[in-house]
């Protein structure tokens, strides 16, 4: 609980301040997330995993400099480097190790970078909160709806406690929160959206669905590598 409160304070303050503070936080969390993902496969301290970290850092440098044209080159050369290491050191690494390294760059680093990208965009100080409205809103409503009405298992092999009713409640709740949030801040925005309320509702709906898919994907990876948790870098 203490760790959760501490992290919530850091996240909220970084979103409010934005700039380099949020950028460094996203980059740091990305590297930690990649480390834990690679750790599941046992490549977190090996050359293949280190290559993934280097590609992620290079990508974040492009993000900070605003050189979005170079991002594609970073991914292309990164993929070439990963495959070169895989081929030269064969059979040290399995093909799924190489794929996991490249997937981790996108699944963790690139996805998280969009929190910063959205924050520095027009009206980003308002729009960026939709990420948390949709994800946290979905988790909260899904939990209570599942406890009260959950009867049909959604993905019993991946997450036995998740129910179809909980998923529906989570997505519905997140969408409603998006509508409420849109009403609250619509008058403060610069007019980037013609209908901010409905735009936020759609964004929250999609965000909630992605939250569910992302959670199940993380569970699937854990099942594949037969681990209970990704790591314990953060107590609690």
Where do the language-model regions lie?
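Membrane-embedded alpha-helical bundles of polytopic integral membrane proteins
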Residues: 1-205
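Hydrophobic, small-residue-rich transmembrane alpha-helices and their short perimembrane loops
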Residues: 209-210
